[in-house]
A protein has these predicted regions:
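Active-site glycine-centered loops adjacent to acidic/histidine catalytic or metal-binding residues
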Residues: 56, 87-88, 123-124, 177, ...
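Residue-level marker for buried hydrophobic side chains located in beta-strands
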Residues: 51-53, 83-85, 120, 222, ...
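Short, solvent-exposed aromatic-acidic interface loops
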Residues: 339-347
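N-terminal active-site segment of His-dependent metallophosphoesterases
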Residues: 33-102, 231
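N-terminal secretory signal peptides and thylakoid transit peptides that target proteins
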Residues: 1-17
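Extended active-site neighborhood of metal-dependent phosphoesterases/phosphodiesterases
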Residues: 39, 43-45, 72, 91-220, ...
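C-terminal region of N-terminal signal peptides and the immediate post-cleavage residues
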Residues: 25-34
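Cleavable N-terminal signal peptides
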Residues: 18-19, 30
Length: 358
C-alpha cells in the first residue's frame, strides 16, 4: 500500500483444484469465460506444511526479484508447500483484464520455479480507480479472480474463499477475505452492493461465520490485505492513517474483524503496511495473533508513524526498513514462524526471527 489517506484527501466459479485440499467459495465467485484450461499446481496432502508468507509484492521491479531470488534459495534448501500472497498483487493500478501482461511481469516471471499453489488476497492497489491504491474500482479486482483460470500458480477462485489442507483431518484451514469495500480510500458511497451493510459484505460475513463454525482444522488462519492491528504507518483498523473520518479510517473493517474473525482464528495474516511485524495478541483480539508481511517489494523506510501512535501494540518483532518475507511451519502440534530479510546490496537473506507461536 503506498497511497496515504491524508494525501489522497488533500489531492482529491472455480477452476479445478489439484491435490487433496478442500475448497469453499464465497458467494461472489466469478467465472472466467473463453480462457484456456490450465492445470493447477496440486496442494500438499501431508500433515507437515511449510508456508511462504509474502505481501505487497507486485511491482515487477528489481527489489521484488531480489526477494523472490531469496525465496527460491529457501525453497531449494527446504521446499515450500504453498504460498500466501497478502494483496497488492499488481501495482500500481491493478490489472485491466484477465489477460493483462502485468500478470506475467509482476507475478509469473518474478516467481518462476516457485511451483506450488499461491493463495492470493486482493489489495487496494488491485482495485484502483482514480489514484493508484484508492481502492475505488472494486470491479477491477474481478480480473484477478478470472486470472485464476489462466495460471497454474495463481489461486483466487473467488474474492473470498477458504482452503483446508489436507481435506481429511485438516492441519490448517486458510480463510482468505476481501475487506477492500470497507477499507477503500475512495469508498463506494453510491454503490449499495459494496456498502458495509450491503450484499457483498453481508454475504461474506455469513459465509465466514458458517465456514469457521464447520471447520475441523487444527489451525485456523485468516488472510487479509488490510490488518486489524498494526504498528506501522497505516495504523490499526478504525484508526487507519490517523484520519478519523467514517468510513476511510477503517472502522467498518475493525467491526468486521471483531464480529467475525478475532477469537476464532489463531492467526491473522495481513499485508498493506510495507513492514514485517509479529504482534502480541491483545484483549481486543481475544487471543488471535496479528502478523504483517507486506515488505516483499517495498519498505516504509523508518520508524512507525501516523495512526499507529494512537493505539500501539506489543510486538515480538518489528522491522520497518528491510524487505523480506516469512515462513510458517505447521504440524498438527506446532506453528513455527521465521522472518527473513533480504540485503538488496548483495541479495543475501538472513533469518532474523524464529519462534514457536503455537
Amino acid at each position: 500500500m503506498t497511497v496515504d489517506r491524508r494525501g489522497f484527501l488533500g489531492g482529491t466459479a472455480a477452476a479445478a483444484v489439484g491435490g487433496t485440499a478442500a475448497l469453499a467459495l464465497g458467494a461472489a465467485a466469478a467465472r472466467a469465460e473463453n480462457t484456456p484450461a490450465i492445470g493447477k499446481f496440486a496442494f500438499p496432502d501431508t500433515e507437515r506444511l511449510r508456508v511462504l508468507v509474502t505481501g505487497d509484492a507486485g511491482t515487477g521491479a528489481r527489489p521484488q526479484w531480489q526477494v523472490a531470488d531469496a525465496m527460491r534459495e529457501q525453497h531449494a534448501r527446504e521446499p515450500f508447500s504453498l504460498a500466501l500472497a497478502l494483496g497488492d498483487n499488481v501495482y500500481e493500478q491493478g490489472p485491466w483484464a484477465d489477460d493483462d501482461a502485468q500478470f506475467a511481469a509482476k507475478f509469473e516471471d518474478p516467481n518462476h520455479d516457485l511451483d506450488f499453489p499461491w493463495l492470493m488476497v486482493q489489495g487496494n492497489h488491485d482495485n484502483s480507480s482514480i489514484l493508484p491504491g484508492d481502492g475505488g474500482w472494486l470491479l477491477r479486482g474481478d480480473h484477478e479472480v478470472a486470472y485464476h483460470a489462466r495460471s497454474a500458480r495463481w489461486f483466487m477462485p473467488s474474492r473470498y474463499y477458504s482452503v483446508r489442507i489436507p481435506q481429511e483431518r485438516p492441519v490448517v484451514e486458510f480463510f482468505v477475505l476481501d475487506l477492500n469495500p470497507v477499507a477503500a480510500y475512495l469508498p463506494p458511497l453510491f454503490q449499495p452492493y459494496w456498502a458495509a451493510d450491503g450484499q457483498f459484505m453481508t454475504e461474506q460475513a455469513a459465509w465466514l461465520d458458517r465456514a469457521l463454525d464447520e471447520s475441523t482444522a487444527t489451525w485456523k488462519i485468516a488472510c487479509t490485505h488490510h490488518p486489524y492491528r498494526n504498528n506501522g504507518p497505516h495504523g490499526n483498523a478504525g484508526e487507519y492513517d490517523g484520519f478519523g473520518i467514517d468510513p476511510i479510517d477503517g472502522r467498518h473493517a475493525r467491526d468486521f474483524f471483531e464480529a467475525h474473525v478475532v477469537g476464532r482464528c489463531q492467526f491473522l495474516l495481513s499485508g498493506h503496511d510495507h513492514s514485517l511485524q509479529v504482534l502480541e495478541p491483545t484483549p481486543a483480539s481475544k487471543g488471535t495473533r496479528q502478523i504483517i508481511s507486506g515488505a516483499a517489494a517495498k519498505s516504509v523506510h523508518g520508524e512507525p508513524s501516523s495512526g499507529s501512535k494512537n493505539t500501539p501494540n506489543g510486538a515480538l518483532y518489528e522491522n520497518y526498513n528491510d524487505l523480506g518475507f516469512m515462513v510458517l511451519d505447521l504440524t498438527p502440534m506446532s506453528a513455527d514462524l521465521g522472518v527473513y530479510t533480504v540485503d538488496l546490496s548483495n541479495g543475501q537473506s538472513a533469518n532474523v526471527f524464529q519462534r514457536k507461536l503455537g
